[in-house]
Amino acid sequence: MAQQYQPGQRWISDSEAELGLGTVLAQDGRLLTVLYPATGETRQYALRNAPLTRVRFSPGDSITHFEGWKMTVQQVDDVDGLMVYHGLNAQNEAVTLPETQLSNFIQFRLASDRLFAGQIDPLAWFSLRYHTLEHTSRQLQSALWGLGGVRAQPIAHQLHIAREVADRIAPRVLLADEVGLGKTIEAGLVIHRQLLSGRANRVLILVPENLQHQWLVEMRRRFNLQVALFDEERFIESDATNPFEDTQLALVALEWLVDDEKAQDALFAAGWDLMVVDEAHHLVWHEDKVSPEYSLVEQLAEVIPGVLLLTATPEQLGQDSHFARLRLLDPNRFHDLAAFRAESENYRPVAEAVQELLDKGRLSPAAHKTIHGFLGNEGEALLTAVNDGDTEASARLVRELLDRHGTGRVLFRNTRAAVQGFPERKLHPYPLPCPDEYLELPLGEHAELYPEVSFQAQPDASEEERWWKFDPRVEWLIDQLKMLKRTKVLVICAHAETAMDLEDALRVRSGIPATVFHEGMNILERDRAAAYFADEEFGAQVLICSEIGSEGRNFQFAHHLVLFDLPSHPDLLEQRIGRLDRIGQKHIIELHVPYLETSPQERLFQWYHEALNAFLNTCPTGNALQHQFGPRLLPLLEEADDGEWQALIDEARTERERLEAELHTGRDRLLELNSGGAGEGEALVEAILEQDDQFALPIYMETLFDAFGIDSEDHSENALILKPSEKMLDASFPLGDDEGVTITYDRNQALSREDMQFITWEHPMVQGGMDLVLSGSMGNTAVALIKNKALKPGTVLLELLYVSEVVAPRSLQLGRYLPPAALRCLLDANGNDLSSRVAFETLNDQLESVPRASANKFIQAQRDQLTPRINAGEDKVTPRHAERVAEARRRLAADTDEELARLTALQAVNPTVRDSELDALRKQREQGLAMLDKAALRLEAIRVLVAG
């Protein structure tokens, strides 16, 4: 053994290939010292079993001098144990290169190089690489890519909007669903799908300051998007020249940005592909004056290609405000308010005619005349068929009208009336006597709405004299929880102090298991509290939340909600109820409202219930009514005679009923049909649920965990604990936490246990693990023994995996047309390709591992025979590669031509189709076809099989 090592020889580490070429420094007794100049690392190995492979190049190989020039080897000499290579450089001149002068940065990543360098991987890794290629290809071609990985129940209208918008180049749309229909999820799906497809790389999210945390939680928990929250402190403390350039997704409060010109300059300079603006209806615009917030968003919309505006419904906004949002998206199309009003008025009769067709299945003469006037003579045949009772013609007519809808491509608005699946609400009021201690409190802002806060804030308040010892709502709550026994109950109150005090009260006075959730806790602490509440067996019966602390959380596995106090605005009340009242809630929402009699609490309850009807139904008019009656409401809460109070209630109720009638009359059923997807969303839901039921992902991930040295153990039903083992292969594996994580593949489990990672094909752990496999050399060589009686012992089969590789920007999405699926070739001794007759899994079941040392000896002995067979493999698969590229070109051309034809025809009748959109699509087609023409065949992996 000792004689095989000579100072100056080049060896490569079998376990640390990333170190580059090593140089033998010394052999001292039983130790061997090797320097790796590329990294400056030195390693000492036991002489008997050093994990090293001798680097030997052969004639035909291309090698690199440490100064950077290359040569093609023609002859190799062994001079005193050192290799000397002779050959030709790039200028075709004869050169000599001793191995001591080889580049230190050579790494054997090509399959053939690694095979002959003795870097042979475990058999399981080869299978892992093959399956990674197959799964990657399938996902890139899937219509669900970017839609199925969200931690939420798949809902038809959300999926339809997400696919429709995210598949556009630089989408510019208004998302105006009614409250509770999931605009934030729709926006997150669009962001996620655009990022995965490469259509967007940098995203800016502008939100009101009070919604920053909610967005942060939603994007991280639901979509695994690592959003950077920017505020003044972070901006000032950053060492970067432009702090915004360091992040892919920035979450910024609009209030701060408007007041900080330096931050504005940095934001404009950073460059963005997509901008999302929440609560866009708060951007004030009038023909003669605009707010600073509106002006800033308008300037950003001029330079950022994609824009998503999340806003209240057009009916709530009013026509002028609605126009203001649309002109942010397309100022050329929406430039004249008067013209927009006229166009909207002209379109209203058409929407009413469609309503008639949908409700009655036929058209009256007046409706027929209206639609004929809108479509012209080209619609006559369709109208005749509709009148003859042709249901297919009715559907076609609706589609024709949808295409011509003035804002149908830029505005998406779903309503609760059109979307089914919401639960019923049941109200349980509990009037309780107001204690004397509260009657003596000084008046202050909302003091009598939240008397416990005022009581505890008194200078002379003592620890012994806690408010929860005399407040009847606490005794009532304890009794209510005992009656409900193990039923999960969510309690929401306005202030964090109240929430923490209530937890103390329940612990001291009842022993009922409770946990608290407030804005003073970090995300990890909130996750633990939410998980404790969600645990059916050992968890808390009650979760007590503050107003702010519960933002962005979903507790719909519970259906009992206690409103310990009432918020000062109807929108906040709707947000509270919305924690449970969501699509997919399977139970009636039981609303428990305790309040103190003859106090402002009682009057606020009456205001919400009798005037706004805000407990039993959503209240789209709440904001308008609060704005209209707020100045009169607040003084009357504290002191007014009953007659004056009742007059206000009656007046507000009448105004609400009038506004609701207006909203109903103004409903645009055609727009609702377009926003709902007319059945397309339902098909996506079905496909996602079917994908959820498959076992391919858990099976694949187990092999991935085994390969990378990740230990997995059962946590509970449908859940696993992952931890790095001592043999962890790569510390960069995206486990998410060095200490370990808990995961589930079950969507329902993930919805109730936010402390668990929801693993789907889109999860960063899955995508990152697959990238580690394919971006490196892992599993691209293997040697195995094949047990098959039909093969003569000693027969050598060669299995080669190729991929059709196209180097192109991700935004072109060429992976959809030419995915990296393996082109497999199985060569026998006579050069015949057996791959079509012997499937991969069939072959895999017949294989046994070979010790690495034995495998290496065999490969070195067979090198001269294997090299020409490897070269012959490319000739075998080249025709299949050419067919695959031709099919990719055909599909790309067909898809883009079809979309161009559709949009061109649409543009003729609907000016919201922008010229820039058509130009971008034509450019994408041209670039895509040009890139596909350059697609090359690459050898991905080699497996040598020896019959035994």
UniProtKB/Swiss-Prot annotation:
ATP binds at residues 177-184. Its EC number is 3.6.4.-. Residues 473-627 form the Helicase C-terminal domain. It holds the Pfam family Helicase_C. Keywords: Activator, ATP-binding, DNA-binding, Helicase, Hydrolase, Nucleotide-binding, Transcription, Transcription regulation. A motif (DEAH box) lies at residues 278-281. It comes from the Bacteria. Interacts with the RNAP. Has a higher affinity for the core RNAP than for the holoenzyme. Its ATPase activity is stimulated by binding to RNAP. This is RNA polymerase-associated protein RapA. The lineage of its organism: Bacteria, Pseudomonadati, Pseudomonadota, Gammaproteobacteria, Pseudomonadales.
